[in-house]
């Protein structure tokens, strides 16, 4: 805990960002490439070991091509798959690229944005994972953010001065939410981000698709401060209990802190 307090916490989105099947980022990537059949199949079908009950029944029916049975099986709370299937059934053409495109266009904008941002979040986490040994450092050409919650990044030019501010917890390097309006760093940071794009089959010029208008890109902090930390021993009897409380900047996940604490 002392190390996290001193260095800050790696600002991973973590598993909860990608759904219980861990594939919302794959949906987002398919949507951004306008591979709508693939996106619809990921949302409505491709039954796997994690699927149970009515959701498994619905996905199995979809995979078998029975769109009506799939629609009937989805729980009412699963609005996205139901909306897609209603559109496909109404069109009456089965699953084709054309019918999938119409179905995707029927999705609620919030659902669409959720999938697109999941794709961006996955790549952000991959950049942070590559930089994890140096996540609290500043590199020449970095786009840095003031802590705890600034959104406007600035280019690191005076490395000595900015590294001192980073060591004091005043600023942090930023990472990418890739998109056409995302400011790009220079030097070593830029090369790392381009390598992550390439590893996922993307190039910088692929980030101009029409659907990026829903998630145009931004910079986020690679680390976040652990504020107002309080640890209390609440052990009673033979049961060891520790109460942990802390504050994080808006938009950051407490699960990221817990994941770091539980590392061996």
Segment roles from a protein language model:
Residues 1-237, 241-245, 249, 259-264:
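Extended, charged/glycine-rich binding lobes that contact polyanionic ligands
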Residues 252-256:
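Pseudouridine synthase
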């Amino acid at each position: 805990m002392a190390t996290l307090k001193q260095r800050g916490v790696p600002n991973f989105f973590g598993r909860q960002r990608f759904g219980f099947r861990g594939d919302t980022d794959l949906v987002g990537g398919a949507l951004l490439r306008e591979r709508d059949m693939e996106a619809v199949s990921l949302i409505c079908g491709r039954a796997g070991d994690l699927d149970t009950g009515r959701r498994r029944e619905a996905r199995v029916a979809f995979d078998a091509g029975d769109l009506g049975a799939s629609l009937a099986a989805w729980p009412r709370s699963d609005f996205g798959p139901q909306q897609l299937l209603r559109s496909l059934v109404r069109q009456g053409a089965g699953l084709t690229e054309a019918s999938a495109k119409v179905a995707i266009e029927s999705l609620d904008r919030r659902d669409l944005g959720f999938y697109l941002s999941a794709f961006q979040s996955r790549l952000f986490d991959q950049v942070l994972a590559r930089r994890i040994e140096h996540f609290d450092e500043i590199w020449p050409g970095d786009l840095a953010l003031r802590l705890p919650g600034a959104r406007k990044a600035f280019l690191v030019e005076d490395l000595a001065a900015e590294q001192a501010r980073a060591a004091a917890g005043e600023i942090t390097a930023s990472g990418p939410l890739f998109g056409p309006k995302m400011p790009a760093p220079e030097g070593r940071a830029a090369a790392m981000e381009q390598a992550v794009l390439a590893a996922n089959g993307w190039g910088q010029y692929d980030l101009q698709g029409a659907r990026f208008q829903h998630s145009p890109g931004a910079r986020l902090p690679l680390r976040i401060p652990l504020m107002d930390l309080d640890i209390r021993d609440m052990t009673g009897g033979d049961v060891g209990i520790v109460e942990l409380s802390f504050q994080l900047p808006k938009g950051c996940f407490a699960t990221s802190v817990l994941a770091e604490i539980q590392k061996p």
